[in-house]
A protein has these predicted regions:
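Arg/Lys-rich, alpha-helical DNA-contact motif
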Residues: 2-12, 17-18, 36-42, 49-152
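Conserved active-site tyrosine of GNAT-family acetyltransferases
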Residues: 29, 47
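Short coil turns linking two alpha-helices in DNA-binding domains
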Residues: 22-25, 31
Length: 152
């Protein structure tokens, strides 16, 4: 049986205990747009294993690399979302996520046509592999076998 890492199965309290942080800290990260909580019909926040890894990475950026929330948001705003949504085109040029650097694309209001009516939690941009060690690859382009062959 495969585990769906995107399935929201962890409560906010469980995530807080696993990361040894306060529930309020997780809520603050959510308010800042660094994480997208799934909310049940009753408003209970739930998180996936993918969200847990994203939060671990955020904590690492803060505690080990000295970044603040603003710096993390700016860095996330550099993720080339169009690469995950079918490539750069005229629609992308009109999208505020392309020319704004205020935060990750899932925090932008009035997004372009490619992202209208899309559940951001299910979007490939939000679901990219979370790894603090690979953030440069995500921002500056995927490491591909073609690039490796060209360097040989």
């Amino acid at each position: 049986m495969d585990i769906d890492i995107f399935e929201p199965v962890l409560t906010i309290g469980t995530v807080a205990r696993k990361l040894n942080i306060a529930v309020q800290t997780i809520r603050m990260y959510e308010e800042e747009g660094l994480i997208l909580a799934y909310k049940t019909e009753t408003g209970r926040r739930m998180f996936s294993m993918h969200d847990l890894e994203r939060l671990r990475c955020i904590r690492t950026m803060i505690t080990e690399h000295g970044l603040n929330l603003s710096g993390i948001k700016k860095m996330m705003s550099l993720i080339p979302c169009w690469e995950f949504k079918g490539g750069f085109d005229e629609q992308c040029q009109k999208c505020p996520a392309y020319y704004e650097a205020s935060g990750p694309c899932w925090t932008i209001k009035n997004v372009g046509p490619k992202c209208q009516n899309v559940d951001c939690r299910a979007c490939p941009v939000y679901r990219i592999e979370v790894s603090c060690n690979k953030i440069k690859e995500v921002i500056f382009g995927h490491k591909s076998s073609e690039n490796n062959k060209n360097q040989e």
